[in-house]
Structure formats: C-alpha cells, structure tokens
Amino acid sequence: MQKSERVNFGSKIGAVLAAAGSAVGLGNIWRFPYETGNHGGAAFILVYLACVFMLGMPIMIAEFTVGRHSKASTGRAYKVLAPGTHWKWLGYLGVLAGFLILGYYSVVAGWTLEYILEAGMNGFADKKPEDFVVAFQSFSKDPVRPLIWLVIFLLATHFVIVKGVKDGIEKSSKVLMPVLFVLIVVLVGCSLSLPNAEKGLEFLLKPDFSKVNGDVFLGAMGQAFFSLSLGMGCLSTYASYFGKETKLGNTALSVGVIDTFVAVLAGLIIFPAAFSVGIQPDAGPSLIFITLPNVFQQAFSGVPILAYIFSVMFYVLLALAALTSTISLHEVVTAFLHEEFNLTRGRAARLVTFGCIIIGVISSLSLGVMQKYTLFDKGLFDLLDFVTAKIMLPLGGLLVCIFVGWYLKRSVSYEELTNGGKLKAGLFNLYIFLLRYVAPVAIILIFIKELGLI
C-alpha cells in the first residue's frame, strides 16, 4: 500500500483520543489503585509518573515513529523500515500478541455486559458478601452465558472496525472517551460524598516513602509498561494513521497524562467507597466482580436508588474502557491482514472476529467445563494471559527499543519527532539515551519479575 493511499485520522484530537483509548483499559481500574494504595500512596504515584516519563514515553514515541514513518500496520512496518531482514518477525510478534490478547480479553470484557444487566435489573440488592462470590464463580464457569456476552462484545468491536479509521475508530473514540470521562468524574463525586471517604482518600494519596523499595520500583515500572499498551503493536498501528502535523512528543505526553488521570480517578472511586464500609479492596477480576458490587450495596444502603445508579454507571464505565482497548487490538490484526494479503477491510475484520470468538469460547470454557484440560498446569485463559503479558509484550517492547534506538537511523527518529525539522527537539539526546539504555534494562527487570525470578 502506498503512503499516499493511506487514510489518516481527521483531527489531532481524534488521534490523541484513539491512542488514549488504546491505553485506557480494565488494568487502569483493577490494578493501578491496588498497587498505589498498598505501595505508599502518593509516593507510588510519584515513582509511577517517573516510570511513565522515563520508560513509557520513550517506548511510546518509538512505536509512534515506527508507525508514522512506515505508514504501515505493525505487521508490515518493520518490513518497510528494514526490508530483507529478520526484523519483520517483530511485526508478526505484535500481530500475534494482539490477536491472542483480544481473544481472552474479550471474555472479561463480556463479563462487564453481564454485570451491567445484573445491576440494571437490581440483582445486587439484598445480597450478602458471600453471595457475590458464589454468583461470580457460577457465572464465570457457566458454559453458555459468558459465551453470549463474548460474542456480543466482539460484534460491537467488529462494527466499529469495519466502519474504517475515520468513521469507525476516530468517531467512536470521540464519543466513548468523553462519555468515559464524564462517568468517572460523576462516580468520583458520589464516592467522595460517602461517610469516612477521607480514609480511602488518605490510603490512596497520603505519601508513605517508607514503603518505597525495589519492589515498588519494579511494580511501578511494570504498571507503566502494561498500562500504556506498549509492546503489542496498537500504538504503532494507530500512529500509521497520524498526519504529518501530529506532534509525536505531545501526543505521547497526552496519552500518558490521560491514562494516569483515569487510573488515579478509578482509585478515587474504589477506595473511598470501600473504606466507607470498612472493606480493603484487592486487585484483579475479584475486585471488579465480587468486592465492588458488595461495596456499592453497603455504601449506599441508606439510599437504594443511589446503589442502583452507581452500580449501573460503574459497569458501563468498565465496558467502555474495555471496548476502547478491544477496538485497538482488533485494528492491529485487521490492518495487517488487509494490507499483507490484500483483503478487503470487511473480510479481514470478519476473519479476526471469527478467530477471536473461537479463542474466546475455549478460553471461557477453560474456566469451567474444560478446566481439566491444561498445558503447563494452566487452562487456555491463564496460559494466554501468561504467555502474552509475561513473555510476548516485554519481549516486543525490548525489541522495539533495540530497533528504534540502535538499528533505525537517528535521522529518522529526529525527523519524526521534529515533523521534518519544523519543531524543536531539545530533549532528543535524552530520548535516545533513555531508549537505548534505560528502557531496555527496565524491561529486562520487568520480564524477570513477571516470571517470578526476582
């Protein structure tokens, strides 16, 4: 595909919101607040921000550079920039990672739809804490209901993708992201109005530098890496739709700020509500689907209508956060098939959706009726999570650093960062230093930590 034929995002704000939508996901809500509250509050946030700017942004800019300069999807970008070399496998790695993640991530995304329905039917009312445990375990192991929601969620994602870059991805981002922001701000306001909310606020934001140690730095580095959707090709694919006027540095900064802003606000929803009823939240799916429904019912027990509204809004928020992520993951694979095999966009999208439904169905069933079928003592859901999050993404991020930092000509990076010399790049040498030396070491440490070796 020639550069002149490639569709670009129609506006700068559309590009920023699309990239931010790729970064904002369920991890912002179920992992970041827990990490922050248990690792020094504001002290962790400061360490995390340092990691975002010293680790996350250099890699993000590197991925943006690859995407815009090649004007190709992640799967083809490295063939364009390094023809006749083995670097093409880095592009294929990103496509495969995106495909596998979309397959099992859509299972969890589908759960949010079940909980929107459950909340909307007032199904959380009058339940005891143990009832939420039983309800979630029963639902997640059900051989039918999760599959229905999985298919619905993937079809919603498919609908956006087949509309194309401008009419699908950009338009949806301009709607979904503002709605997400409004929902999260309203929910924060409700949560902070609860009795004893200040205890949760203190737990989340009061700096405790005595807790800052090596583990905290590793946790902050890992959170920054995974939260910003690095290493999976989403950002470089979106960057291939950036216009020449898009400022890569400013866009990366905007994405980092928005992603962190959403994560902190998620904490301001969860902790004040939880502490108002004397519950200390955990992390992961159990936080979202077991702990929080119980918290919301108890926190607003005096005004049941508020418990109802709060619960519905919260799960709509989760679904929107998941959808912006599944759209970007789907686009990585669809764009590759569209360009590499000259398929129509619609046919490429159908292949991706169908393939992910198959992966999603098996992943979902591996939590229930097929849980006895394992590989390396893991069902498919847990195996895909392990292989992608702990191996493929860190490896992809590391190779991006090496490719842009060492293989690609510095003049290419300079040209992209300065928009052909039109912008100043006073921090260019620092960017190259971080990309060549700091980010690779950090990723190797993340890789080792995720594998449980340190």
Name what the model sees in each region.
Residues 2-5, 9, 170, 174-323, ...:
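Membrane-embedded translocation segments of transport machinery
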Residues 36-62, 145-146, 392-396:
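Extracellular loop-to-transmembrane helix junctions
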Residues 1-30, 59-64, 68-81, 85-92, ...:
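Membrane-interface "cap" regions at the ends of multi-pass membrane proteins
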Residues 3-7, 35-39, 69-93, 106-162, ...:
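Inter-helical loop and helix-membrane interface segments of multi-pass membrane transporters/permeases
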Residues 8, 13-14, 22, 147-148, ...:
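Loop-to-transmembrane helix boundary motifs in multi-pass membrane proteins
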Residues 8-19, 44-47, 86-99, 148-153, ...:
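Select transmembrane alpha-helical segments in multipass membrane proteins
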Residues 11-51, 199, 239, 250-253, ...:
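Transmembrane helix-boundary motif of multi-pass solute transporters/channels
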